[in-house]
Amino acid sequence: MNEIIRAIEKEQIREDLTQFNIGDTIKVHVRIKEGNRERIQVFEGTVIKKQNGGLRETFTVRRVAYGVGVERTFPINAPIIDKIDVVRRGKVRRAKLFYLRDRVGKAAKVKELTR
């Protein structure tokens, strides 16, 4: 049974999206349907969490807009995600960056990864 589920999930996983890690600043292009028309909205922020794996994988992006912290969780394989752009790579030593919620201003920045 487990092999059957894995085989079905493998078919539905999207391969066209850019790979990113925790700490990266990304732009998520999301399709939004309003009435009978569809448009693309861009949500830019820092990836603070990646969860699960395979078809059920999700990630959370955090940004501060007008002094208010906004977090949005997206399923990676959702059809509403048009594309993901990596703005900059971050250098972090944690898998979950929940400590950024308590920080304000420059303290909430993630160091940039230099290669």
From Swiss-Prot:
Matching entries from InterPro entries are given as: Ribosomal_bL19, Ribosomal_bL19_CS, Ribosomal_bL19_sf, Translation_prot_SH3-like_sf
Q: Which residues cross the membrane?
A: none
What's the stated role of this polypeptide?
This protein is located at the 30S-50S ribosomal subunit interface and may play a role in the structure and function of the aminoacyl-tRNA binding site.
> What is the designated name of this protein?
Large ribosomal subunit protein bL19
* GO biological process per UniProt: translation
Question: What NCBIfam families does the entry give?
Answer: rplS_bact
Among the Pfam families in the record, one is Ribosomal_L19
- List the keywords (alphabetical): Ribonucleoprotein, Ribosomal protein
* Coiled coil feature spans: none
* Record GO terms (molecular function): structural constituent of ribosome
Q: Which family does it belong to?
A: Belongs to the bacterial ribosomal protein bL19 family.
Q: What SUPFAM superfamilies would the database entry show? A: Translation proteins SH3-like domain (SSF50104)
Species: Clostridium perfringens (strain 13 / Type A)
Q: Which cellular components does GO assign to this protein?
A: cytosolic large ribosomal subunit
Q: Does the keyword Ribosomal protein apply?
A: yes
